[in-house]
Amino acid sequence: DHDVNRIHEGALHILETVGMGVIGNLPPGAKEMLEQGATLSDSDRILIPRAKVEDILAKTCRTWTLHGLDRDRSIEISPGHVHYGTAGGAVNIRDFQSRQYRETRLFDLYDVTRLIDTLHNIHWCYRPLIARDIVETETLDINTAYALMSGTSKPLGITLGSVESVEAVTSMFDLALGGEGQFRKTPCAHSVQGDGVPPLRYAEDRCIIKEASIRAGIPLM
């Protein structure tokens, strides 16, 4: 507990004194932070007061549900409970037939997802690999989400590459769940949307996608 507290205190100190830079223009969320108590340093870094961070953490949800397409496979996230899921985004795979490494393709994503569906000790399926045979971002995101839905009824995890993808993918989830607005009620997928770039900077384009995901009702992990 002592070490955890040291790390926590260090993070609060850095956010308040060093702050976060921005690659590009200030995204809407950053502007709201400035309106709610954050300040800009002389070097245009966003300084976030300790009290503001602590206030937000105090309001953060401690328990929630990761919904599955099959509701019996939904899982409750809460203190004291441990669940395991996939992660990453492999771009190469060892071909079963040729025994050689090659780039991952959409059918690999589907096959691996089907395997994950059968493994009892994996509780959710975040996109384990990237379909390298699809180049265009929105097309990749749509097909990735479809392959995951087709391969498992466990809770899903995705990463989206554009604002357009957010709308397209959530609309597809709506259809799978029975109609408009159903995904917002029981979101069967969460999203991992990193918005930070070393060293301690927000990337405008990633922030905008993250904000669009929040507005669309996609839970963030």
Report residues per predicted region:
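Acidic/polar, glycine-rich intrinsically disordered N-terminal extensions of enzymes
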Residues: 1-107
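Helix-rich catalytic cores of soluble enzyme domains
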Residues: 103-221
